[in-house]
Every structure is written in C-alpha cells, then in structure tokens.
C-alpha cells in the first residue's frame, strides 16, 4: 500500500515520483504526486484516463505535453488540466530535470498501476520504453481498464484484445500487480533535488 512520502523510481523512463498525498489519506478522492523527469525522460506511452482528471503544475524546468494531438510546452508556474477521456503524453524537453506536481482525481487504482509499472522497470522486465511484454501488459491493462486506456485502437477493440490476451497471460503466470518486493510498501529512495 502506498503511503504519503513514498518514492518510486522508474529507471527506464527517467521518472521519480514522490507521493505527497496518498489515496488512503483522502478516502480515494484524489492523489497528489511530485514528479521529477530527467532530460529526455517521458511517460511510457500516450494514454487516457476515462474517469480521472489530471492537473499538472510545472514547478521547475520545461515539460512538453501532447494533449489531444496538440503539443503544449509548459514551464515553471504554468498549469495544465487534462480532462477525463483526453489522450495525453508528457516528456522533459529541457536540458535539466523537470519537476511538476500532479493531482489525480479520483484516485481509483492510480497508485497500484504506477507501483506495478515502476517496479517492473526496476526489475528489468520492461522494454526500452518502459512497457512489459504484451501478455503481461494485457493482464495489467485488463485490471486497470477503468484507470487507463490507449487512445487507439477503439475501446471495443482494446476490450476484445484484452479478453483474449489477459486470460492467456494469467495462465502463463503473469499478474496484474507487482510491488517493490515488499507486500506493504515500495523501497525508499532519496528525495529528488
């Protein structure tokens, strides 16, 4: 279980996340994270959240977003709101670390998803973009379909693919969640500068 103050690191995507306010502290109403992204670091893939609003406030550096196909560069002091169902991706387009605060509302299973993806990257179980093998991804995506989806193909096709891929992945031992080797909390990492 994620707690306020926990830190997760994805060495593949170059993201470091500190949970400022965990879902347990808000009864699932929202989660607040501070994110540090290394130069050329990025979220693993373009995605959308069908039921969640994300509010990004850039604190340091420069973050480039692609939101509904439009490129937006946000600098320190600027805020960007991504509404439910809106395809988006972000990356650090600057030459120094970028830092932003993000509120995810409602929390749903955001923490579990991030812990799963980051711990798989820590264990070397992702490709160079931070994505696990397709069968493992099908199991994870099926379990988190209310949290995150791809902007394409259409949702009905994603559901069809997951209906076939997820059972096969589970039969081969893939699980929908992964943790940092402890049942109750991720590893502790130093705070970002």
Residue ranges with predicted function:
Residues 1-30, 36, 41-52, 62-193:
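Jelly-roll (double-stranded beta-helix
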Residues 56:
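Structured binding elements
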